């Protein structure tokens, strides 16, 4: 799921021996805070690999009708097909469709905005066609009469429009043999499938890249580039960081109060500042771009965004500094093509940095970077720790989920039996354990 995410589980040299408070009160805020004593970011089951964007909780399947899924051997099963809704942390609402038909949802599952390349969409040649469907059907097209006329469906309700849209998406996301039970919904699905064109992946709502940098005190450390679809992201350093003399600046060393897409950020650490680590947090409020993928750390079925209200988005980065010696920074990236996690260790100091990853020891010369790919099986949980001298430790946890689940084997029981791993056949279960 997306490039370069730094673990908040950093253990190292605190800026002042106490945690710098990181209170955020306004939309679009960048704050500095010590990571010393930050504790485990994965304690609640969250994936510390989130590189930025929206974080949301699944509220359930809300606007849907029925579809018929071919499960093989001449058998079909009825499944619910339509729009899910999610609540965004910090405020906002999302509407999503499923792109993982054979994997059920989990009640109140947590979801993270995720780049296509770290989901099954990354290896799907038809991923862009799904985006075309999203932009040209319900709910982006709210005039159902116009949509029905254009598609030849005759008449559509919100439920049948959502069902037809979901069915068309499944044909591209999973290669599923699926039809809408409603005749008008099926006509919409067929039209969307026939008309779909490949489009480019939409921009992220907000990320900081890279999300870990290092350097010597007495200098500007960076750059960290802002990538965002929001018009503006405000920036500020909190009071404790300001008291320590640390500033967020542009490339010319001027303090920054407002940034947008492409802005390069630097952390100006005065000479003599005790060796330490700080965090950067960018926040903004915007509509998340339609077509962004949403993946769950708990392996609930992968979703794709169909609509968004103004929502809170955020992204984090870490900054490490020292006066001399090795000055490491560590990031990790899910690499679906290599079936593993790329752990990238950079050393911006003036001495080599030796670290342990698993049972192996590696050395990064001064001014260089080393990437190690840790193999992880599909759908497997991983817990990766990088350790070094003086108690240095970075931990990365999550689940590698790069593929849709295959078609479930049909039941060997009597006629009318339900395949044991098929999507829930009853549309009455709208809070979890169901397909979209």
Predicted segments, located by residue:
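Secretory targeting and sorting signals
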Residues: 1-44
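N-terminal low-complexity, Pro/Thr-rich disordered segments
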Residues: 20, 38-64, 204-205, 243-245, ...
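Short, surface-exposed polybasic-aromatic patches that bind anionic ligands, especially phosphate groups
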Residues: 44-198, 298-301
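Extracellular Ig-like/FN3 beta-sandwich strand-entry sites
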Residues: 164, 262, 273-279, 352, ...
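Acidic/charged, solvent-exposed loop-and-adjacent secondary-structure segments enriched in E/D, K/R, S/T
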Residues: 178-326
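Asparagine-centered strand-capping/turn motif at beta-strand->loop junctions
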Residues: 226-228, 342-349
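Intrinsically disordered, low-complexity Pro/Gly/Ser/Thr-rich segments with frequent PxxP/GP/PP motifs
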Residues: 251-268, 360-379
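Surface-exposed, short loops/turns at beta-strand junctions within beta-sandwich domains
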Residues: 269-277, 373-383, 401
């Amino acid at each position: 799921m997306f490039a370069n995410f730094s673990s908040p589980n950093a253990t190292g040299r605190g800026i002042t021996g106490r945690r710098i408070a990181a209170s955020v009160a306004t939309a679009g805020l960048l704050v500095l805070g010590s990571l010393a004593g930050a504790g485990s970011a994965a304690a609640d089951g969250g994936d510390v690999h989130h590189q930025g964007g929206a974080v949301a909780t699944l509220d359930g399947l809300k606007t849907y009708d029925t579809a018929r899924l071919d499960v093989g051997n001449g058998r079909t099963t009825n499944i619910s097909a339509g729009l899910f809704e999610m609540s965004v942390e910090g405020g906002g609402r999302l509407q999503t469709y499923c792109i993982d038909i054979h994997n059920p949802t989990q009640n109140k599952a947590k979801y993270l905005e995720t780049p296509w390349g770290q989901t099954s969409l990354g290896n799907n040649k038809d991923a862009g066609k799904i985006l075309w469907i999203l932009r040209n059907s319900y709910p982006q097209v709210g005039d159902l009469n116009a949509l029905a006329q254009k598609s030849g469906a005759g008449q559509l309700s919100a439920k049948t429009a959502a069902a037809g849209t979901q069915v068309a998406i499944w044909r591209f996301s999973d290669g599923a043999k699926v039809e809408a039970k409603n005749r008008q919904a099926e006509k919409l699905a067929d039209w969307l499938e026939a008309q779909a064109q490949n489009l480019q992946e939409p921009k992220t709502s907000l990320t900081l890249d890279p999300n870990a940098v290092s350097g010597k005190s007495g200098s500007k450390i960076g750059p960290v580039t802002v990538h965002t679809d929001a018009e503006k992201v405000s920036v500020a350093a909190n009071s404790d960081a300001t008291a320590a003399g640390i500033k967020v600046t542009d490339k010319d060393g001027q303090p920054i109060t407002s940034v947008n897409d492409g802005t390069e950020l630097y952390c100006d650490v005065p000479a003599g500042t005790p060796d330490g680590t700080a965090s950067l947090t960018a926040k903004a409020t915007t509509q998340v771009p339609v077509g962004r993928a949403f993946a769950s750390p708990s392996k609930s079925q992968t979703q794709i965004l169909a609509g968004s209200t103004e929502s809170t988005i955020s992204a984090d980065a870490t900054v490490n500094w020292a006066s001399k010696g090795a000055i490491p920074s560590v990031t990790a990236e899910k690499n679906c093509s290599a079936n593993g996690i790329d752990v990238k260790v950079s050393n911006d100091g003036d001495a080599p940095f030796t670290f342990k990853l698993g049972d192996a020891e590696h050395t990064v010369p001064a001014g260089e970077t080393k990437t190690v790919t840790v193999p992880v099986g599909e759908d497997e949980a991983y817990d990766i720790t990088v350790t070094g001298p003086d108690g240095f430790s970075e931990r990365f946890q999550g689940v590698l989920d790069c593929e849709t689940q295959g078609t479930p084997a049909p039941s060997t029981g009597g006629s009318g039996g339900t395949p044991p791993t098929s999507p829930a056949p009853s549309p009455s279960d709208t809070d979890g354990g169901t397909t979209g």
